[in-house]
A protein has these predicted regions:
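Surface-exposed loop and turn segments in beta-propeller and other repeat-based domains
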Residues: 18-37, 87-110, 180-208, 255-282, ...
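Beta-propeller blade signature
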Residues: 3-16, 67-87, 141-181, 238-276, ...
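Extended amphipathic secondary-structure runs
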Residues: 48-51, 55, 119-128, 170-189, ...
Length: 375
């Protein structure tokens, strides 16, 4: 069949769904292949606002990359239901020339890093939180995949330019009124927003390591905003400049030494499937030689140094902020509730007991926290 993103609707899921949109009706914006932005994030988020359905879409593909270190930013479209149940789609943020969108991809033409956007309605505004493309950025380092159709290699490289560009532009928070006028709530000043943000806060709530506004939730008349902190995953680099190596306990150093001894022992193990061909060793040495001299370049070293400068003062662990008026924010945490391995606030759930949240923690597993309902 036809390859396409699809959007379905149902008033009774047990009786089935009706398709209301596909890639064609969504202006061919959805990027849904693995090589695309955020591993093909496609139709990313949706919310009802002002009697319309607003949908954020990942659009970045290898074919529309502005340059080797930039994917095309997200789109925002509005769906209005017709009398016969079909939907008419209008681009709000997208291709201004071709499709007549009011805003460009990513809303602000100076903002180029966010592959997706998360949506939440609060106080009669639609809040739009940016989500930077960290997947491709980290893939560049892990597998040395740089540029269109790069095959990559096991063991990675040191090309940190994509990641550094993300850190240069940490995430913004916008809000849109019922007339689709945009305001900058959190972010740096640009030509589009010369006076800066309504809150006075810079991009990433003033912290470059905040790379997603991952989840938002309305609870007890307040808007809660949680982030993803990239510095948790980048501690393998950050530990060399943030002082954490000096803070290691004797037990931690003992564990590290045990890991090194285990590695050396594994390297000495004889491969029972080996064929005794000495040329195989020569090929291994040749690969290692080529790998080092391909990756240890002036450009890559400069990009690594720039990355280390960002990580020097980064505070690991997700951030959580709360606001009653949608503009002035209070800080709940900037360090994942004291756990640097809680790198993201992944999900909220409102219950009769209070506001629950689940952390993203790929190191030793998720945690669930609750803020009890006020009496």
């Amino acid at each position: 069949g036809k390859s396409s993103a699809t959007l379905l609707i149902s008033s009774d899921p047990e009786k089935g769904f009706t398709q209301i949109a596909d890639s064609d009706s969504l202006f061919n914006y959805p990027a849904y292949r693995y090589s695309d932005s955020i591993y093909g994030g496609s139709i990313w988020d949706m919310v009802e606002y002002n009697n319309s359905l607003y949908v954020s879409i990942c659009t970045g593909t290898e074919d529309n990359m502005p340059n080797n270190n930039t994917m095309q930013s997200f789109a925002l479209v509005r769906g209005d239901q017709n009398a016969d149940g079909t939907f008419t789609w209008t681009p709000v943020a997208g291709d201004q020339k071709k499709d007549g969108a009011r805003y460009t991809f990513g809303i602000d033409p100076e903002r180029t890093r966010s592959g997706a956007a998360n949506l939440m309605v609060f106080n009669d505004y639609l809040y739009i939180g940016e989500y930077n493309d960290e997947e491709i950025a980290l893939e560049r380092i892990l597998f040395s995949k740089t540029g269109k159709n790069a095959d990559g290699q096991f063991g990675g490289g040191l090309d940190c330019r994509f990641l550094n560009a993300n850190l240069d532009q940490s995430v913004n928070l916008y809000r849109m009124d019922k007339n689709e006028n945009m305001e900058l709530v959190v972010g740096n000043s640009t030509k589009m927003f010369p006076n800066g943000s309504l809150s006075g806060l810079k991009s990433g709530f003033g912290r470059n390591e905040n790379q997603y506004i991952w989840r938002m939730e309305v609870y007890d008349g307040k808007l809660y905003v949680g982030t993803h902190d990239a510095s948790s995953l980048l501690e393998c680099f950050g530990q060399f400049v943030n002082g954490n190596l000096l803070k290691r306990t004797p037990s931690e150093w003992k564990d590290q030494w045990s890991y090194l001894k285990a590695l050396m022992k594994a390297l000495q193990t004889v491969d029972p499937n080996g064929n005794g061909n000495p040329d195989a060793l020569a090929q291994t040495i040749k690969f290692s030689y080529n790998f080092v001299f391909k990756n240890i370049t002036v450009r890559n070293m400069a990009s690594a140094i720039k990355l280390l400068n960002y990580l020097r003062t980064a505070k690991r662990g997700f951030d959580l902020y709360v606001t009653e008026d949608g503009v002035n924010f209070e800080t709940v945490t900037i360090d994942g509730f004291g756990d640097p391995y809680n790198h993201g606030l992944r999900v909220f759930a409102t219950t009769d007991q209070g506001l629950c949240l689940g952390t993203a923690n790929p190191f030793y597993g998720t945690q669930i926290w609750i803020q009890r309902k006020a009496d």
